[in-house]
Every structure is written in C-alpha cells, then in structure tokens.
C-alpha cells in the first residue's frame, strides 16, 4: 500500500513540476513574441497563399500575390528580430529536450540530449529569408508551398519548446492537417540540413 501512495504522490509531483516548467517556457517565449505580429502575419500569408493558389486566372491571382509581398517582408523582418532578441536570454532557459515527451528538469539533468532554441530560431529566420529570396528560382506557386512549410516548421519548433515534440507534431496535424515529416520534406534543402543537424545531433 505504501508503494502505491508513494507512486501516486511521485506522479503528482512530476506532473506539477512539468506543468510549472511549461508555463515558464510559454511565458518566456510569449514575452518576446508579443513584441511582434508574427502569428497574425503568418495566418494572413497562409490564407493568402491558399486564395492565390485557388485562382485559375492569372489576372485574378496577380493582385493577391502582389498584396502578400509586404506581409512576407514583415515576417522576414520579425523572424530575424525575434532570433536576435532571444539571444539575450540565459542559455539554460532556452534548452529544448530532444525526447518525444516532456520531462521536468531534462535540460539540467541531461544537457547532452538538448539543443538551443536560440540557434534553432536562427535556422528558421535564415530559411524563410532564403526561400523568400528564391535563389532556386521556383515559380511563385512552388515558392508559396516552400514558404508555408518554413512557417509551419517554425510553429512546430515554438510548440516543441513550450510543450514537447509529440505535442508539437499533434498540433501541426490538428491545425494544418499536415504531418511533421511532410513539412520537413517541403522546406528548403538548406533549412532541412541545418535543422536536422541541430535537433538530431
């Protein structure tokens, strides 16, 4: 009986510690995101891409693409500023566990199994910028698909930091009906390489 009581209270303790740590992470990232309109701009972009891609008449889609350019530029600037601003945070607070589920204090107890969110945000900012420059000379339709994937992967990373990799992947599927592997395959080769080098190291 004593064993079951100990196990019960231990489970409660772990859950409470995990919840407290996740709240701290949400508050930390939220305090930086609130300076920008990233979420609003990202929704506008993805909705705009869908509208433009749904038009079969180039004359009707052209104004939509044109209107999206200023939003794309804003997202590029905000991602770069977010990555720069977060570098002022003490390193231990930005560590992210590679484990699929959240474990309290994993960033302190198992630092070798973590990566730095600050570095990851640099990868996302660079990836969006590179895709927007369109060095690969993709047609606008294909570029929009790639930019959408870059944004979805950025969202996944934010949820991974705040919750866990498993929760982030579930939210990606629930919100966009798109799997993590699909998104990873759709970003630029440079983003995919730099991303995997960091999160799988």
Region spans (language model):
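Glycine-rich, aromatic-bearing surface loops/beta-hairpins
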Residues: 140-201
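C-terminal single-pass membrane-anchor helix
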Residues: 7-15
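Charge-rich, acidic-biased intrinsically disordered regions
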Residues: 66-69, 90-104, 169-181
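N-terminal topogenic membrane-targeting module
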Residues: 19-90
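Interfacial alpha-helical end/capping and short helix-turn segments at domain and membrane boundaries
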Residues: 72-158
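Generic structural signal of hydrophobic/aromatic residues within well-ordered alpha-helices
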Residues: 25, 29, 64, 82, ...
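Short acidic, glycine/proline-enriched loop segments that cap or flank alpha-helices
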Residues: 36, 55-56, 135-142, 161-164
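Feature marks short, highly hydrophobic, charge-poor N-terminal signal-anchor/signal peptide-like helices
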Residues: 1-7
């Amino acid at each position: 009986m004593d064993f079951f009581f100990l196990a019960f209270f231990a489970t409660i303790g772990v859950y409470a510690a995990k919840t407290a740590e996740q709240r701290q992470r949400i508050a930390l990232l939220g305090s930086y995101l609130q300076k920008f309109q990233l979420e609003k701009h990202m929704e506008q972009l993805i909705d705009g891409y869908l509208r433009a891609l749904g038009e079969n008449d180039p004359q009707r889609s052209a104004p939509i693409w044109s209107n999206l350019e200023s939003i794309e530029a804003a997202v590029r600037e905000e991602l770069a500023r977010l990555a720069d601003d977060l570098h002022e945070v003490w390193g231990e607070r930005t560590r992210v566990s590679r484990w699929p589920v959240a474990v309290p204090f994993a960033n302190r107890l198992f630092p070798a199994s973590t990566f730095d969110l600050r570095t990851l945000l640099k990868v996302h900012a660079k990836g969006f910028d590179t895709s927007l420059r369109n060095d690969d000379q993709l047609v606008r339709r294909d570029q929009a698909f790639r930019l959408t994937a870059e944004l979805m992967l950025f969202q996944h990373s934010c949820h991974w930091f705040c919750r866990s990799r498993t929760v982030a992947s579930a939210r990606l599927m629930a919100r966009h009906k798109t799997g993590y592997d699909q998104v990873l395959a759709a970003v630029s080769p440079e983003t995919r390489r730099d991303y995997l080098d960091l999160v799988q190291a």
